[in-house]
UniProtKB/Swiss-Prot annotation:
One of the record's GO molecular function terms: RNA endonuclease activity, producing 5'-phosphomonoesters
Keywords: Endonuclease, Hydrolase, Nuclease, RNA-binding, rRNA processing
Higher taxonomy: Archaea, Methanobacteriati, Methanobacteriota, Stenosarchaea group, Halobacteria
Enzyme class, broadest EC rank: hydrolase
Enzyme nomenclature, EC number: 3.1.26.-
Encoding gene, per UniProt annotation: fau-1
GO aspect biological process, one term: rRNA processing
InterPro entries: DUF402, FomD-like_sf, Ntdp-like, RNA-bd_FAU-1
Function: Probable RNase involved in rRNA stability through maturation and/or degradation of precursor rRNAs. Binds to RNA in loop regions with AU-rich sequences.
Family, similarity comment: Belongs to the FAU-1 family.
Gene3D superfamilies according to UniProt: FomD-like (2.40.380.10)
Segments of this protein annotated with the region Disordered: 389-408
Protein name per Swiss-Prot or TrEMBL: Probable ribonuclease FAU-1
Length: 505
């Protein structure tokens, strides 16, 4: 793996925590800062010391972000991507903690959009901004940042150049209104894995919901013999309330080293934060169910249902609690079928509701193909979505070459778990304009969106009945670039061949 597993300390959070903790423990990694729930499930005395890697579920529950030192991140990512062939991984362009030079390109109501380039030896002590008069940052930018006005004490105008730090990065498939890779700020932070130093901050802040624990921890920190860099204060997270005095001191010393490096404008490469984003496909979510099931009662489709949102997640917790823990003599879950009917009737989508077709790409980004109405629903997992083509109409339908006109309909039939779906295009008068069959990762029907990742190769059926397989070259290019694993590409090619034969009959 390129690194010693015993030197990698991983903290895991979110809906995938139990399965990923089990997977990493089996691969001989050290888990630290475990939550009370994880401690109870594994009955292990996990250490509360600083981490070198964090694994955190994304806000949309679709995957995880892995952040920390480069060698450790790569090592952990390799282990977790092996959970399923439809787990896809991409580099995080803006991992938290990385410092950039930014130029404001657009001001909005509550924040500004900025172009980001890597900062070279930022002068953070003097507060002077870099002299980049000869550089047009938007042309050289590696990413886009969103700077909330309440994350800076500066007056922001379009064209301003400043030093910023990534405070929270977003996965490439994220579809927020900010259109940014990260939320950034002008306040600099030095994360030590258990404690964080904040430039311009005073005293000690404890980020915990327990006031008594906060007071006790603040008192412990006052007992530690450390020299803080001038102008930096301390913030510690909730996990630190369970840490020993020795562990606290170690975490603070690590944060101090990073703060001094930031102040000197020379952050050491071995401690610079890097990141990988992992998106779990449906097949991978079910593989994670199996891993979790070896630890605790887990219904079929546990992670698939939880990925639908907080309400669905709470429903899963209730169902599993009622079924009881493994081996305790209570009622157990017997069936191994995903309860599509129950899940969609409870949370959606069902007939008459509107959903988006959310089209992921192997390069990491994703976009909506548009909203449509669910015009048919079946308990076997099939959903029909009808979209009306509006506007003046221009151009042609992708690959089909037939005119795209206002009044056309696009009828898409998807089935939960299937590796493909057809869309039939018809004119206002019902004339067939062609059928486009998209080959993709197993489809998931979430309450507000149908989701998958497109695998490039497709099969089309023209109005005259001719069948053609298209975009094999794009699939091959994606494999060469490392965007699609070979095993996933083989599956896509196999599905394409089967569909081509079936449609040509």
């Amino acid at each position: 793996m390129g690194t010693d597993n015993h030197s990698v300390r991983v903290s895991v959070r979110g809906i995938y925590a139990t399965a990923l903790t089990k997977r990493l423990l089996d691969a001989d990694y050290e888990i630290v800062q475990a939550s009370p729930v994880i401690r109870e499930r594994f009955d292990i005395d996990f250490d509360t010391v600083y981490n070198t890697v964090t694994v955190t579920t994304t806000d949309d529950h679709q995957g995880v972000g892995i952040h920390g030192t480069e060698s450790a991140v790569r090592s952990v990512a390799d282990v977790l991507t092996s959970c399923g062939r439809d787990t896809l991984a991409w580099d995080d362009l803006t991992p938290p903690g990385v410092i950039f030079t930014a130029q404001i390109t657009e001001t909005q109501g509550s924040g500004a959009i900025c172009a980001l380039i890597p900062a070279e030896n930022p002068d953070t002590e003097s507060k002077t901004e870099p002299d980049l008069n000869d550089v047009h940052i938007p042309d050289e930018s590696v990413a886009t940042g969103y700077l909330p006005y309440d994350s800076t004490d500066k007056h922001i105008e379009q064209g301003d150049i400043m030093t910023v730090q990534s405070h929270r990065s977003m996965p490439p498939w994220d579809n927020t209104d900010q259109r940014a890779d990260a939320v950034v700020g002008t306040t600099l932070r030095a994360n030590g894995g258990l404690a964080t130093l904040i430039q311009g901050h005073e005293g000690v802040t404890v980020d915990t919901y327990d006031d008594e624990d906060a007071r006790e921890l603040a008192g412990m920190i006052e007992l530690i013999d450390i020299d803080l860099p001038t102008g930096w204060g301390i913030e510690v997270n909730h996990a630190a309330t369970q840490a020993s005095l020795t562990a606290l001191k170690s975490g603070l010393e690590r944060a101090i080293d990073r703060a001094e490096d930031i102040s000197d404008g020379a952050v050491a490469e071995e401690v610079t934060s890097t990141g990988r984003w992992l998106w779990f496909g449906r097949e991978s979510r079910f593989a994670l169910d199996e891993i979790r099931r070896s630890v605790i009662t887990t219904i079929h489709g546990h992670h698939r249902i939880k990925a639908a949102g907080e309400t669905a997640s709470a429903g899963v917790d209730l169902a599993e609690a009622l079924c009881g823990d493994i081996g305790d003599g209570n009622v157990q879950i017997q069936h191994n079928e995903f309860p599509f009917e129950v899940v969609t009737q409870q949370f959606g989508p069902t007939e008459g509701e509107r959903v988006e077709l959310y089209h992921g790409k192997p390069e990491g980004h994703a976009f909506s193909l548009g909203q449509g109405e669910v015009t048919d629903w079946d308990a076997n997992g099939t959903i029909e979505v009808t979209r009306r083509i509006s506007g003046h109409g221009s151009g042609t339908y992708d690959e089909l070459g037939t005119p795209r006109e206002s009044g056309d309909t696009a009828v898409t039939r998807v089935r939960e778990g299937r590796w493909w779906y057809p869309t039939v295009y018809r004119s206002r008068d019902g004339e067939h304009k062609g059928t486009y069959v998209n080959i993709c990762t197993p489809i998931e029907c979430f309450p507000k969106s149908i989701r998958y990742v497109d695998l490039h190769v497709d099969v089309v059926k023209y109005p005259d009945g001719t069948v053609e397989r298209v975009d094999d070259d794009e699939l091959n290019t994606a494999v060469t670039a490392g965007h699609i694993p070979p095993a996933l590409a083989e599956k896509a090619q196999s599905v394409a061949s089967s569909l081509e034969r079936a449609l040509d009959k």
